[in-house]
């Protein structure tokens, strides 16, 4: 009987793309695959763990096209997240949330019209009529896809069952402030990770790592002192300093967050 790899091989590209990576800005991993957002080439690559390219999603030119495998187009895609054999993509340059059905390779737009605009909470009846504003990172669960929206400094969620958008946290103002829902504020939220009922967010201009409790949308700063209070220091949370953190991931075997402290050129760990 053919296994999943055999079935998937039938839709793999016959040759590896010749272009090197150009500003890769997103990564997602499964037990046997790596997915890379090759941002500068406007494409998504599916690789095995040895680094061999198996499939390319997107023609490699900046455009906004749904459809099958390499007949599709992205524009500066960044954040990636996998859930239930679906790859979710923050298509930043198209101001859209998109998904790739991995078994077939089909690319679909969940919401976004290709232009920056003011997102509106509510049901999404016509995906291409919904405005987003620079979605940068995504984190998917079985039921929701969470997005950091760098262009409007808020955290949004797309409900996969209802097909609806909701703002989970953030006032929209460029600030770094704890609180609940719209009473909280972010300063260009970037990297995102979801663990059970908690979201962890890199607040880039706030030089901070923040948490969001999904039960009540309460935002709390774990590390960071606020906008312009950046630095380069290890130590207890109240003394540690970051600068423009961009990416975050949870350790698989310990309660530790790994943080790409981009402005300092460091990889830091934060014990929860």
Predicted feature residues:
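A short loop-to-beta-strand structural motif that recurs across blades of beta-propeller domains
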Residues: 42-45, 95-99, 106, 153-157, ...
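Gly/Pro-rich loop segments of beta-rich domains
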Residues: 1-25, 51-78, 106-134, 164-188, ...
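Conserved beta-strand positions in repeat-built beta-propeller and related beta-rich domains
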Residues: 36-40, 89-93, 147-151, 201-205, ...
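Blade-level signature of beta-propeller repeat domains, shared across WD40, Kelch, NHL, RCC1
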Residues: 244-272
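Short coil/turn segments that connect the beta-strands within blades of beta-propeller domains
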Residues: 31-32, 84-85, 142-143, 196-197, ...
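Short loop/turn segments that connect beta-strands within beta-propeller blades
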Residues: 48-52, 101-105, 159-163, 213-217, ...
